[in-house]
């Protein structure tokens, strides 16, 4: 009888409540019911492209048991670890299928172990499933922060770092060494969510989420300890030794004996003690920390940030990779938007008994715009237009049917217009609409070898096309749709969780 994944999750939870040192995941790794669940979730395209499996039309679990037996005997040459070193053969095709199956099983086990582990260190850790979630928090919180630090988490990480993070989870020794072999033999590039995947697809995203969650908890707990440090620092009897500890943690060892630099760091550290709240925001591998500090103290906080990640996670950040941004002067390019602040003057008139007094109040507001020039350059790289904005025919799509060509252009426009629905200059998207509309017409003209006039007559000015099995006409890019889009107020879509790969490569 087949069992669902939720059944095993409940079993693991009950055993973990009874036994605190519960770590028997490797025993369930060799059960056949897990392989049945994994076989259902293997993509159909993978099986469809495999010619050798098409002939058999069925998959026998005897071959699966042979791989498990070879894994127990540690004959890794016959298993899926050394796929890249082999040539294409029947064993290679089966080894890829085994890899897909075993990968799904590891996904289930790591997901269950991650749910069982409860980390009560930070209760205010909140996740935003929507892409537009950070911009709502921008409008509410970032107005009060003058300085920010922006950086990118590296995708290329040493595999032993992931092994050390996995060691903290409740994993038994056998499963831990099995994961260690997988990480050291194949996983060199982590793929964050919504990123184009390289190498291991699903396991890489799981490892990246665990790795990013560990970074968040480590850095936020470090900031909480830093707030409690001033009281310990003032009550310390030997102030010179405590300043030496600070310099040893935040400065290089060569500068340790320089007493003048110790005094300078001590003064800077006393100034940085009085900072207010810190706003920490991370989306996939993009990290933004906004501070309520002066520029001089922000420079010191930048050194703290670099030094912390170097000692805790062995990252070698350069100073140009960790940017210091002042909201009053600079613009931030964050997730495909240009974010900057401006001041508006509000005149206030107060009526007194004998006269009227006029006051001018400066109100700080946030502006989130569409980078229209960067969008045109990006569309030119993908073959939709020139650098100047003149539309071209998409030759790679001219092989498709007419309905598929129009649908692809329509979906691209809907993703761009939906993604930038919360921007303040939505009217600039009319240029993108014009480029996509004429490039669609030119691809149809290139396919049928016709002039543009005949295509406008055939598909009408709105490029509407009648679809089979549907009533009415389906409009693609009409200016009436754009007028309704422009009349709408600025709105963020909290349902937006994924974007088109073309749009993602633009804002990443």
From Swiss-Prot:
InterPro entries, per the entry: Domain_X, Maturase_MatK, Maturase_MatK_N
Any matching Pfam family: Intron_maturas2
Disulphide bridges: none
Subcellular location as annotated: Plastid, Chloroplast
Entry keywords, A to Z: Chloroplast, mRNA processing, Plastid, RNA-binding, tRNA processing
GO molecular function: RNA binding
GO cellular component, one term: chloroplast
Main subcellular location of this protein, as a coarse class: plastid
Alphabetical GO biological process terms: mRNA processing; RNA splicing; tRNA processing
Family of the protein in this entry: Belongs to the intron maturase 2 family. MatK subfamily.
Stated role: Usually encoded in the trnK tRNA gene intron. Probably assists in splicing its own and other chloroplast group II introns.
Stated name of the protein: Maturase K
Classification of source organism: Eukaryota, Viridiplantae, Streptophyta, Coleochaetophyceae, Coleochaetales
